Design a protein with these regions (language model features):
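N-terminal presequence-like segments and the immediate start of the first folded domain
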Residues: 1-61, 65-78, 84-131
Length: 131
């Protein structure tokens, strides 16, 4: 099991949301890289394109399953990247971290893009975990 340390160094602004500026993993025997997960169910059906919260819940369920397939769990995540298309969804996107990563805030990047692979996707999240 990796020893994961999360730090917010002095001299850098406080995080704007529930994330850590620096995450180190010592003694990691395995890194798990999860491709971007989206708001689609097991059959590939995209959840309603106007329901960010429903898609976010599905994204996190999919991410949890992907991590488990690699032998990791949410608490092992050291870095996530969140991709969204609508700047108005920034507060909701930032809300994902305290909801799902409480007490284990990973290093995080939030990107606003012109679009994702399917125009009905409202967000996509990729992750790296250390176990």
């Amino acid at each position: 099991m990796a020893k994961i340390t999360r730090t917010n160094p002095e001299g850098i602004s406080k995080p704007f949301s529930n994330y850590s500026h620096v995450v180190t993993a010592e003694g990691a025997q395995k890194l798990v890289f999860c491709a971007g997960q989206v708001g689609a169910d097991v059959d590939g059906k995209v959840l309603p394109p106007d329901d960010f919260d429903a898609q976010a819940k599905m994204v996190m369920a999919n991410l949890t399953k992907a991590l488990a397939a690699g032998g990791a769990k949410i608490a092992d995540v050291t870095k996530i990247t969140i991709f969204i298309c609508n700047p108005h969804d920034v507060p909701k996107a930032r809300g994902i971290l305290p909801t799902y990563f409480a007490g284990a805030a990973p290093a995080s990047t939030l990107c606003i893009l012109r679009g994702l692979a399917n125009p009905n996707f409202l967000l996509e999240i990729e992750a790296i975990a250390a176990v």
